[in-house]
């Protein structure tokens, strides 16, 4: 990989690691850059997901205080995330590559919509927290919650982007606690999905992984995860969403252009 390309990937990984620790959707930063550099979509997806594991781990560790008292809930939900991640990775590796070419733009649009509507979702969750009727009972035992976490894992294993936003919304609605508690649990569940997905890629798609990309994103996202867990929460959410949305549109443009060739 050329020096300029490596620098671009490094800073994309740094920003993605920071964003993932705070709001999720870091893949909407790294994925467009990899596509713009001419890397095939599936190779870009699996290399990106593998590299971001380090950043996920850093973000999860940084939010460990917000996990206090959530151990039992995590033990109930983590298996669903892991199974979902394996399912999503299997779909990515076994469906024809042309499916990903057509599915990725639609998934990016879905992820961008989640980014755009995130503030309203968070306002709704906060309103529930302040309503005593919704604070009386923790609904984490519900089968629906487990199913939704599994489906978010499938989505994450197939296409990493914005699974964090999905999970924050799901956890915020179905469990008691604050947004920060939901975000901390999200970091653990996303880490689980990405670990099992990366393991699947290592076992069954080793030759399709771009290891230069993995190494650069691993180092830079690790640094970004530390930054995000410490000071990233002080950054303006509108600015973060604006950057994510702009880069997501770039990715969408590249993909549509490739489809029209």
Where are these regions (language model features)?
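Selected transmembrane alpha-helices and immediately adjacent juxtamembrane segments
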Residues: 1-42, 126-183, 215
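Residues within membrane-spanning alpha-helices of integral membrane proteins
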Residues: 6, 49, 104-108, 112, ...
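Residue-level signature of the transmembrane alpha-helical core
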Residues: 10, 14, 18, 49, ...
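A helix-boundary/kink motif common to multi-pass secondary transporters
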Residues: 24, 39-40, 96, 178, ...
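Selective hydrophobic functional segments
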Residues: 47-106, 195-238
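Transmembrane helix exit motif
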Residues: 57-68, 106-134, 252-261
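Cytoplasmic-side transmembrane-helix entry/capping segments in multi-pass membrane proteins
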Residues: 70-80, 104, 129-130, 184-189, ...
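Hydrophobic alpha-helical transmembrane segments in multi-pass integral membrane proteins
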Residues: 87-91, 149-159, 196-206, 251-261
């Amino acid at each position: 990989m050329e020096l300029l390309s490596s620098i671009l990937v490094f800073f994309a990984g740094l920003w993605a690691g920071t964003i993932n620790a705070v709001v999720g959707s870091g893949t909407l930063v790294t994925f467009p850059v990899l596509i713009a550099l001419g890397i095939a979509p599936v190779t870009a997806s699996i290399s990106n997901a593998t590299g971001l594991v380090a950043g996920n781990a850093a973000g999860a560790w940084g939010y460990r205080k917000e996990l206090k008292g959530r151990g039992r809930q995590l033990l109930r939900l983590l298996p669903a995330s892991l199974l979902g991640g394996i399912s999503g990775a299997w779909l990515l590796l076994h469906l024809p590559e042309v499916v990903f070419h057509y599915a990725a733009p639609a998934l990016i649009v879905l992820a961008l919509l989640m980014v755009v509507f995130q503030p309203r979702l968070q306002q709704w969750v906060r309103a529930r927290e302040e309503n005593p009727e919704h604070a009386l009972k923790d609904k984490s035992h519900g089968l629906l919650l487990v199913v939704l976490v599994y489906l978010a894992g499938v989505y994450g294993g197939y296409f990493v982007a914005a699974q964090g936003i999905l999970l924050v919304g799901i956890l915020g609605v179905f469990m008691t606690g604050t947004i920060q508690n939901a975000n901390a649990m999200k970091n653990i569940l996303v880490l689980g999905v990405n670990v099992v997905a990366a393991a699947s890629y290592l076992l069954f798609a080793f030759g399709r992984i771009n290891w230069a990309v993995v190494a650069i994103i691993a180092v830079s996202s690790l640094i970004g995860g530390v930054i995000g867990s410490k000071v990233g929460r002080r950054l303006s959410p509108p600015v973060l969403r604006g950057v994510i949305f702009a880069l997501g549109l770039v990715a969408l443009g590249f993909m549509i252009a490739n489809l029209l060739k």
